[in-house]
């Protein structure tokens, strides 16, 4: 490909439905965004967390943001299950008691292949998407779910 000046990115652009084309697409082209994804604050109650995590297109995860809307954590259904097993009064807790701090993230301009690799390596189902080229690189712009990426394999 490179001998003729035809790059992998050109291939992805001209063959977007092919296996290689799908794997080379950018995260921003397939991520869930805006009203499809739940975000909560550190002091959100467990009851509200559960409601949000089941009310959005992205189910089973919620990003945790601070007052500036910067990402500070994530709560997944696995985090909730582990928390419930250890606590006899879980409904007195809030998001910051449950969340995974410094969650794995991916840049909006990264290829799908990188997200698949990161998720498989870390055994996670959801990545929060950041736009690291923006003026606010810690503000989440979307989420990508492993199940959605399986169609790119």
Set out the residue ranges of the language-model regions.
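Internal, active-site/partner-interface "lid" segment
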Residues: 2-32
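Bateman (tandem CBS) regulatory domains
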Residues: 23-37, 92-103
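Terminal peptide-recognition signature
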Residues: 30, 53, 69, 98, ...
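Short hydrophobic beta-strand segments in globular cytosolic domains
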Residues: 37, 71-72, 81, 135, ...
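The conserved cystathionine-beta-synthase
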Residues: 40-58, 84-87, 105-133, 143, ...
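Helical hairpin unit composed of two closely spaced alpha helices linked by a short loop
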Residues: 61-110, 114-117
């Amino acid at each position: 490909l490179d001998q003729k000046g035809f790059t992998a990115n050109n291939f992805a652009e001209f063959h977007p439905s092919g296996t290689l084309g799908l794997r080379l697409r950018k995260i921003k082209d397939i991520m869930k965004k805006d009203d499809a994804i739940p975000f909560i604050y550190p002091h959100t109650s467990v009851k509200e967390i559960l409601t949000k995590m089941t009310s959005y297109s992205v189910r089973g995860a919620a990003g945790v943001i601070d007052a500036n809307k910067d990402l500070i954590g994530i709560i997944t259904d696995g985090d909730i299950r582990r928390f419930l097993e250890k606590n006899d009064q879980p409904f007195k807790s809030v998001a910051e008691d449950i969340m995974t701090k410094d969650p794995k993230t991916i840049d909006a301009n990264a290829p799908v292949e990188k997200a698949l690799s990161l998720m498989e390596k870390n055994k996670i189902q959801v990545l929060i998407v950041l736009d690291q080229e923006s003026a606010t690189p810690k503000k989440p712009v979307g989420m990508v779910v492993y199940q959605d990426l399986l169609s790119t394999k």
